[in-house]
Curated annotation (Swiss-Prot):
<feature type="transmembrane region" description="Helical">
    <location>
        <begin position="406"/>
        <end position="426"/>
    </location>
</feature>
<dbReference type="GO" id="GO:0009252">
    <property type="term" value="P:peptidoglycan biosynthetic process"/>
</dbReference>
<feature type="transmembrane region" description="Helical">
    <location>
        <begin position="155"/>
        <end position="175"/>
    </location>
</feature>
<keyword id="KW-0961">Cell wall biogenesis/degradation</keyword>
<keyword id="KW-1003">Cell membrane</keyword>
<comment type="similarity">
    <text>Belongs to the MurJ/MviN family.</text>
</comment>
<keyword id="KW-0812">Transmembrane</keyword>
<keyword id="KW-0997">Cell inner membrane</keyword>
<keyword id="KW-1133">Transmembrane helix</keyword>
<keyword id="KW-0472">Membrane</keyword>
<dbReference type="GO" id="GO:0071555">
    <property type="term" value="P:cell wall organization"/>
</dbReference>
<feature type="transmembrane region" description="Helical">
    <location>
        <begin position="311"/>
        <end position="331"/>
    </location>
</feature>
<keyword id="KW-0573">Peptidoglycan synthesis</keyword>
<feature type="transmembrane region" description="Helical">
    <location>
        <begin position="95"/>
        <end position="115"/>
    </location>
</feature>
<feature type="transmembrane region" description="Helical">
    <location>
        <begin position="185"/>
        <end position="205"/>
    </location>
</feature>
<feature type="transmembrane region" description="Helical">
    <location>
        <begin position="122"/>
        <end position="142"/>
    </location>
</feature>
<comment type="pathway">
    <text>Cell wall biogenesis; peptidoglycan biosynthesis.</text>
</comment>
Length: 536
């Protein structure tokens, strides 16, 4: 396999983002169509609560933790013998397939009993969960296949696969827009199960190609027992983390009956930069650093991590400022259509601004964790994650009782995210002295990026004040709106005009001030694996 370096890392990230971008784009279209035709009522909130519960149950079985445990061990076995690695993956896949089926059957039986004892909105939530639950089996197998394809550097199909679900979702909502609200919600749940089956099927060709490389049974057979310890810690951490998310949803419901919808829609937007780029870098970085560890190339691993941290900070600083500036026009474009009320739009904007502070630490924390996972040290990041989740739940309950605003849940999450990053880096510096000053060095080198981005934001707001268009970015504008933003075209025009203004100012300042990290972001050559356009 080709040696890992900054160029190969960027090429792999480019391929992953190409597929993931289309999935996220269809996801945004899904949000627009869903808000336009299904609105914001308790039944839709029940649907989102059931949908969130499905992912909670899937992650209890491992979810993303599977890759963290599997990839370093798989790369270790492949370095010894390809047959051992192939046999191990077969065992790994069978185990989680059978576990997912058994787990689903048990939960389905429990939900059926519970469902027979309740009525009202809780009955709807439970029934939707029962319908959606089988999709968790295929979500699990998609995750298992994805871990293998990441090791094979086949990132495009993995990133593209979720778009199958989104396209099915969009088509169903559009076709069922005139049906009875209750029937169309339950029909959508059935279609989503089929969509998740197709998502899993997209990953099959790459998996079958790998398994065809070696069909012989190795003399030394490796059991998945080697992963029991890291998976146990991971499942505990993931379970508490998902419990934290569910706690957020139920607390939001306690504050406001439609609160889960506000939280869900804002989280979907907040996760866009984190999942599209932050976790994309981590997905590419973990196999690369694992190979560096197996080959004893510690300097190469240091360089890869430093490069990844700098790149991620540059992107996330821009994303954070963009989220603060464009929360209102962006939410208008996505949701302020049809039967979706303006009060819900404003509530989502306030929650979204609370989440903006979590983008940078949430993107950096997985990169720091890669240092531990690559050395098969799963204990530290898992324990830190558990502590952060527990603290977050405590802060959420306190904030909920004191403020009684859904947005307070988002601010608590942002605060805890920075604490989690600080704890992770402190532990990394203690156990790996070589990396001790790397995070501080990264933030120091990114100072110019932060200053340039803040200047661009100030200039953008200044232009809004001069042109009397502060209603674009502020819920309570400083000037009287020149015209109401009712039509979709008007909303899109304002959003893209504001975005173009900010980005043109940003990259104009970057060129003027020679902010290299920002200039790299718009260099196609850089993203294809070349060096800085300023150096060239």
């Amino acid at each position: 396999m080709r040696k890992d370096d900054e160029g190969s890392l960027v090429r792999s990230l480019f391929n992953l983002l190409s597929g993931t971008f289309f999935s996220r784009l269809t996801g945004m279209l899904r949000e627009i169509v869903m808000a336009t035709y299904f609105g914001a009522d308790p039944l839709v909130a029940s649907f989102w609560l059931a949908f969130r519960t499905i992912f909670f149950l899937r992650k209890l079985l491992g979810g993303p933790i599977l890759g963290l445990a599997f990839i370093p061990h798989f790369e270790f076995l492949r370095a010894q013998n390809i047959s051992r690695a192939t046999f191990f993956f077969r065992s790994f896949s069978r185990f989680f397939c059978y576990s997912a089926i058994l787990f689903t059957l048990i939960i389905e039986l429990g939900l059926c009993v519970w469902c027979s004892c309740v009525t009202g909105s809780l009955f709807d939530t439970l029934l939707l969960t029962i319908i959606l639950l089988p999709s968790g089996i295929f979500l699990m197998m998609y995750t298992v296949n994805s871990t293998l394809l990441h090791c094979e550097k086949k990132f495009f199909s993995v990133g593209l696969a979720p778009s199958v679900v989104n396209v099915s979702w969009i088509g169903t909502v559009f076709l069922a827009r005139n049906y009875d609200p209750r029937n169309r919600i339950f029909g959508l749940a059935v279609v989503l199960v089929i969509g998740f089956i197709l998502e899993w099927a997209v990953t099959l060709p790459g998996v079958m190609k790998f398994l065809g490389q070696s069909k012989e049974v190795p003399q030394e057979r490796d059991s998945i027992r080697a992963l029991i310890a890291p998976l146990s810690l991971g499942l505990l951490s993931m379970g508490i983390f998902q419990l934290n998310l569910l706690c957020d949803m139920w607390l939001a419901r306690y504050i406001n009956e439609v609160g889960p919808l506000y939280l869900m829609y804002s989280v979907r937007i907040q996760q866009l930069p984190v999942h599209l780029f932050g976790l994309g870098v981590f997905t590419v970085l973990l196999p690369a650093i694992s190979r560096c560890v197996q080959d004893q190339e510690h300097q190469q691993g240091y360089d890869l991590l430093r490069f990844s941290l700098k790149l991620t900070v540059a992107v996330m600083v821009v994303m954070t400022m963009g989220l603060l500036l464009f929360a209102l026009p962006g939410v208008r474009v996505l949701y302020e259509h049809g039967v979706f009320p303006k009060t819900a739009v404003h509530a989502i904007v306030e929650v979204l601004r609370g989440y903006s502070g979590s983008i940078i630490p949430m993107a950096l924390a997985p990169l720091v964790s890669a240092l531990f996972y690559a050395r098969r040290n799963y204990k530290v990041p898992m324990l830190v994650g558990i502590i952060a989740a527990v603290v977050n739940m405590v802060l959420n309950v306190i904030g909920c009782l004191v403020c009684k605003q859904v947005a307070v849940l988002a601010y608590a999450t942002s605060l805890v995210s920075w604490g989690q990053l600080a704890m992770l880096w402190y532990c990394a510096g203690k156990s790996l002295p070589t990396y001790k000053g790397l995070m501080w060095r990264t933030f120091k080198e990114s100072g110019k990026t932060v200053i340039t981005t803040i200047l661009a934001a100030v200039i953008t707001i200044g232009v809004n004040i001069v042109t009397h268009t502060t209603y674009v970015v502020f819920i309570e504008p400083l000037t009287v709106p020149t015209k109401p933003l009712v039509s979709f075209l008007d909303q899109c025009g304002v959003f893209f005009a504001e975005s173009a203004l900010f980005l043109s100012v940003l990259f104009g300042l970057a060129k003027l001030l020679k902010t290299e990290d920002l200039m790299n972001l718009i260099s196609f050559q850089y993203w294809k694996g070349h060096q800085s356009i300023l150096r060239n």
